[in-house]
Amino acid sequence: MTIWVDADACPNVIKEILYRAAERMQLPLILVANQALRVPPSRFIRTLRVAAGFDVADNEIVRQCEAGDLVITADIPLAAEVLEKGAAALNPRGERYSDATIRERLTMCDFMDTLRASGVQTGGPNTLSPRDRQHFAAELDKWWLESQRKK
């Protein structure tokens, strides 16, 4: 089991939660990004730097993740691909993607892309609230407990 992070877009506060969780759970945490990242010294935490470019980090995560892994991403198409491989996917707000919800999210993502392409300003997500951070940490712990039961 490995936790993969789509790190270019992951908020620092979520990375901090993940650093602590990797130590506590003694699980590999791999942050994939197209830029250099500073991470705390740990035998469980490492970075994987990829070339800059559209979906390069996403493609590397899909290539390397396995069934039973967890991928942290707000990227809906990436979440869909890792779910197909049997990995779990969790966004930085603590929403766990599932086979049941991912199709709806992909449809909404496509719709928003169409709106943006036609010139409509759609805005971005709200900033992470303390409640979002708590929800993320709780869902991370829930995934960990479920993974331990499956062993």
Swiss-Prot record:
UniProt xrefs under Pfam families: DUF188
UniProt similarity note: Belongs to the UPF0178 family.
Family annotation (PANTHER family): UPF0178 PROTEIN YAII (PTHR35146:SF1)
Name assigned to this protein: UPF0178 protein YaiI
Designated gene of the protein: yaiI
